[in-house]
Amino acid sequence: MKKLLYLSLAAFLMTSGSSMTFAAGGNSGGSSPAQDVKKCKKGEVLKKVGNVKKCVKVESGILPDDELYEQGRVLAKSGEYEWALQVLAAIENQNDPRVLNYTGYSNRKAGRLELGITYYRKALAIDPNFVLAREYLGEGYVAAGRIDLAQIELGEIKARAGTGSEEYRDLAKAIAAASN
């Protein structure tokens, strides 16, 4: 019975189009679909159905917003900015400060500095205490040569999260590097 099941599964996988499929477990090391999204083709996300992870075309509603956000965040942090923007755009709640923040991050890193800054400001208008958005906004200001504005964001992070926070340290480092 198991042999028939495996043969059926193998036949299905060979005829299921160009999307990649991954068995859960095994050598996955317990990684999440968000981490595994980079195994997919650009324009796809990883969807877990039962014990199988499958790459599917990214579109609104294909996954819960939190899962799309995590996959978009992973893509953005790994330098896949345009792909990340596709995933983030599929999120239904476009007013989530996290979504706005990583949309800003991806745009800034892709060379659209002013657009990135606009998204950080939108995120902060919703949640002024979102220190990661403040860090990224400050880094955007550094990239624009506006150290004065970056210093203001550094002060805001200090007031909200302290000088020991990663966001404070990272922005302080970016400001120091630009000032030398």
Q: What are the functions of these language-model segments?
A:
Residues 20-70:
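Long, contiguous interaction/recruitment modules in multidomain scaffold/adaptor proteins
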Residues 61-94, 98, 107:
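Alpha-helical segment of the N-proximal tetratricopeptide repeat
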Residues 89-93, 124-125, 159-162:
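Conserved structural position within tetratricopeptide repeats
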Residues 96, 130, 164-165:
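Residue-level recognition of tetratricopeptide repeat
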Residues 99, 133, 167-168:
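TPR alpha-solenoid repeat register
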Residues 102, 136, 170-174:
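Canonical tetratricopeptide repeat
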